[in-house]
Amino acid sequence: MLSSLGNPRQAAAQLMNFALILSTAFMMWKGLSVITDSPSPIVVVLSGSMEPAFQRGDLLFLWNRNLLRETEVGEVVVYNVKDKDIPIVHRVVRKFGNGDTAELLTKGDNNLSDDTELYAKGQDYLERKDIIGSVVAYMPFVGYVTILLSEHPWLKTVMLGIMGLLVVLQRE
């Protein structure tokens, strides 16, 4: 099994194969980002704030190219808060104004109050630039892998190690 590593040319080919897999995944992610006009075209629901519409662990697909249509009340959007790294998935409950100057107020379906406490200090409403995208599709529970990897960091090392071994030890 490990004898295939004895040949330097074969080991280099396996390493290149592994690098090709990683770079292909990266290019697919970047391509999807360009197509959807969203820095994060796929996100995972991390909390129960949107139940019953979305459960923790659901994988959401976003679209941010609404050139002819504005974000409307009732639409589920994903937004970033200034100086915070975690995207938030909530529903638009109020809209003030139109176009690029529109201000949005959001709230989780399972929350008692709106999101004003979650916004950046001094910010009362979201602007269009805060929106990462609108939810257009979802896959239930597929995102639990991401949640497990973030809650148990050692699993990342184990998974990467197994993937690396599979690529290196694979016979052609």
Curated annotation (Swiss-Prot):
Subcellular location: Endoplasmic reticulum membrane
Residue intervals passing through the bilayer: 15-35
Known catalytic reactions: Cleavage of hydrophobic, N-terminal signal or leader sequences from secreted and periplasmic proteins
Top EC class, one word: hydrolase
Sites carrying sugar chains: N111
Membrane topology: Single-pass type II membrane protein
GO molecular function: serine-type endopeptidase activity
UniProt EC number: 3.4.21.89
Region (C-terminal short (CTS) helix) location: 158-169
GO biological process terms, semicolon-separated: protein targeting to ER; signal peptide processing
GO cellular component: signal peptidase complex
Top-level taxon of origin: Eukaryota
Active site positions, chain numbering: S49, H90, D115
Free-text domain note: The C-terminal short (CTS) helix is essential for catalytic activity. It may be accommodated as a transmembrane helix in the thinned membrane environment of the complex, similarly to the signal peptide in the complex substrates.
Known partners and oligomeric status: Component of the signal peptidase complex (SPC) composed of a catalytic subunit SEC11 and three accessory subunits SPC1, SPC2 and SPC3. The complex induces a local thinning of the ER membrane which is used to measure the length of the signal peptide (SP) h-region of protein substrates. This ensures the selectivity of the complex towards h-regions shorter than 18-20 amino acids. SPC associates with the translocon complex.
Stated role: Catalytic component of the signal peptidase complex (SPC) which catalyzes the cleavage of N-terminal signal sequences from nascent proteins as they are translocated into the lumen of the endoplasmic reticulum. Specifically cleaves N-terminal signal peptides that contain a hydrophobic alpha-helix (h-region) shorter than 18-20 amino acids.
Family, similarity comment: Belongs to the peptidase S26B family.
Protein name in UniProt: Signal peptidase complex catalytic subunit SEC11
